[in-house]
């Protein structure tokens, strides 16, 4: 999958799920399940409920995504 195919959206973390998965509410009101990207996992970046994040979603499955960035 090429990077150009991904959709980037901002959202807020609603809850933390097992295995570093998170439920994120996007700015358009949709709720997706997202996991942490590899660089965030490698650098031990902590994500808590209420954090603003940038989520990368594929157009093929709009219910799953990858957390790419955590805002301060």
UniProtKB/Swiss-Prot annotation:
Entry's family note: Belongs to the IF-1 family.
Subcellular location: Cytoplasm
The protein's name: Translation initiation factor IF-1
Domain of life: Bacteria
Classification via SUPFAM superfamilies: Nucleic acid-binding proteins
Function: One of the essential components for the initiation of protein synthesis. Stabilizes the binding of IF-2 and IF-3 on the 30S subunit to which N-formylmethionyl-tRNA(fMet) subsequently binds. Helps modulate mRNA selection, yielding the 30S pre-initiation complex (PIC). Upon addition of the 50S ribosomal subunit IF-1, IF-2 and IF-3 are released leaving the mature 70S translation initiation complex.
Keywords, comma-separated and alphabetical: Cytoplasm, Initiation factor, Protein biosynthesis, RNA-binding, rRNA-binding
Alphabetized SMART domains for the sequence: S1
